[in-house]
Amino acid sequence: MKSIVIFGGAGFVGKHLIRRLTKNGHKIIVPYQRSVQEAKIRLLGVTGQVIPFRYSSLEDKRLKSVLNNTDICINLKTTYDQKKGDFNNTIYKFNQKLIRILKSSKELKQFILFSGLGVDIDKNSTRSIAVHKSEKEAFKQLDNAIIIRPGVIIGGGDIFLKRLLPIFKSSFFVPLF
């Protein structure tokens, strides 16, 4: 049974990933900073298999201890604070600090960064640039970094579909998913 830390595990993709990994018997730790419904996260696996973990910053000694004792670190946290839109701090600097912690760990962990669709340094998007810089940093600092560039992801429980549902109800057309 591997121990896996998933940053961003309370999100849409994270919940589906946790369900899949818990079916395979892995222990999941979900660090979070903001308010999260811990009970819903705990119920994604059997009792004690999924552990929500509140931390204040990446410099938190308890978080560093958790990262030192885990097999795999997955970062799904490549979204941004919608109010501030400060991509450099919320994406790049977070990943930079996380990579530095993993590199200084006694056992170098498998690091998986969930990147973004169409990420490119040549784009005018500050988010795209921040994610691209994070990818470069991961490859430069860690030998076993994996970057996953997803396509468009929608599904049950997704905010996108919830917002479209009223339009579908009043429309003659029904999308087939």
Model-found features: residue ranges?
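Structural motif
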Residues: 3, 71-72, 110
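N-terminal Rossmann NAD(P)H-binding glycine-rich loop of SDR-like oxidoreductase domains
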Residues: 3-26
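The conserved SAM/SAH-binding core of class I Rossmann-like methyltransferase domains
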Residues: 31, 76, 148
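N-terminal Rossmann-fold cofactor-binding loop
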Residues: 31-36, 56-57
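NAD(P)H-binding glycine-rich loop region in Rossmannoid oxidoreductase-like domains
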Residues: 44-97, 101-103, 117-123
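Conserved Rossmann-fold NAD(P)-dependent oxidoreductase catalytic core, especially the SDR/UDP-sugar
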Residues: 79, 93-141, 145-151
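Glycine/proline-rich active-site loop of Rossmann-fold NAD(P)-dependent oxidoreductases
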Residues: 155-163
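A conserved pocket-lining segment of Rossmann-fold NAD(P)-dependent short-chain dehydrogenase/reductase
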Residues: 166-177
